[in-house]
UniProtKB/Swiss-Prot annotation:
This is Ribosomal RNA large subunit methyltransferase E. S-adenosyl-L-methionine binds at G91, W93, D116, D132, D156. It is found in: Cytoplasm. The keyword Disulfide bond does not apply. Belongs to the class I-like SAM-binding methyltransferase superfamily. RNA methyltransferase RlmE family. Its main location: cytoplasm. GO terms for cellular component: cytoplasm. The keyword ATP-binding does not apply. It holds the Pfam family FtsJ. It catalyses: uridine(2552) in 23S rRNA + S-adenosyl-L-methionine = 2'-O-methyluridine(2552) in 23S rRNA + S-adenosyl-L-homocysteine + H(+). Disulfide bonds: none annotated. It comes from Paramagnetospirillum magneticum (strain ATCC 700264 / AMB-1) (Magnetospirillum magneticum). The active site is at K196 (proton acceptor).
Length: 244
């Protein structure tokens, strides 16, 4: 989750950087006390057109463009919908959700509730909660803030990477499973669940559960997702409804 400017939502934009972006590459010298990994990260940020475009448009992170692109393809967010955003900080996805569902409208608008384990700044049009989603009280806090069923549950949660692909894959699948369990409790029939996974997709048991509860399950890697990143997203639409 890259950080960017902290302006509020309220703009319309396309799904990618403006055509006038500079084709210049910035090289960063490694300071004596700066690790090579930090230098490479800084250089990548400086040369990333999505980072520049996020700042220009007032999005808190480049991740906003991932949500915009997923929404353009799958039509996830619509006016009046109620959305839960898990792993929301610093708020890029939340900003897009606020815009798309019209959460700032005094009448007829949607509702957006976000939660992250990290502290994050309040966002106009959204209820921003700080807390560990794995904590026992987290689901109830989200349900109370939402005040009713959700139409969309988004999860951009990710565990710290270890550098060991199999371990990282299992960790993020665990987060997806917990997010899915919550989604099955709060989604209204016809609802949508979107979650970050790593390449290799979902485990068979998780995929079977998704297919059992949703009419359509697809994987997608939006253009704004870094080419070198192993992340991809599972998009499950058409929630069949609770079996209880």
């Amino acid at each position: 989750m890259a950080t960017g400017g902290k302006k509020s939502a309220g703009r319309t934009t396309g799904s990618g950087p403006a055509g006038g972006s500079r084709n210049l590459t910035v090289k960063v010298k490694t300071a004596k006390r700066r690790k090579l990994s930090s230098t490479l990260w800084l250089q990548r940020q400086l040369n990333d057109p999505y980072v520049h475009e996020a700042k220009r448009l007032g999005y808190r992170s480049r991740a906003a463009f991932k949500m915009i692109q997923l929404d353009e393809r799958f039509h996830i967010l619509k006016p009046g919908l109620r959305v839960v955003d898990l792993g929301a900080a610093p708020g890029g996805w939340t900003q897009v959700a606020v815009e798309k569902v019209g959460a700032l409208k005094p009448k007829g608008g949607g509702k957006v509730v976000g939660m992250d384990i990290l502290e994050w700044d309040p966002l106009p049009g959204a209820i921003t909660l700080q807390g560990d989603f794995l904590a026992d009280d987290a689901p109830d806090r989200l349900k109370e803030a939402l005040g009713g069923p959700a139409d969309v549950v988004l999860s951009d949660m990710a565990a710290p990477t270890t550098g060991h692909p199999s371990t990282d894959h299992l960790r993020i699948i665990g987060l997806v499973e917990v997010a899915l369990h919550f989604a099955l409790e709060v989604l209204t029939p016809g609802g949508t669940f979107v979650a970050k996974v790593f390449q290799g997709g979902t485990e068979k048991t998780l995929l079977d559960q998704l297919k059992k509860n949703f009419t359509t399950v697809r994987h997608a890697k939006p253009p704004a997702s870094r080419q070198g990143s192993a992340e991809t997203y599972v998009v499950a639409t058409g929630f069949r409804g609770s079996s209880e």
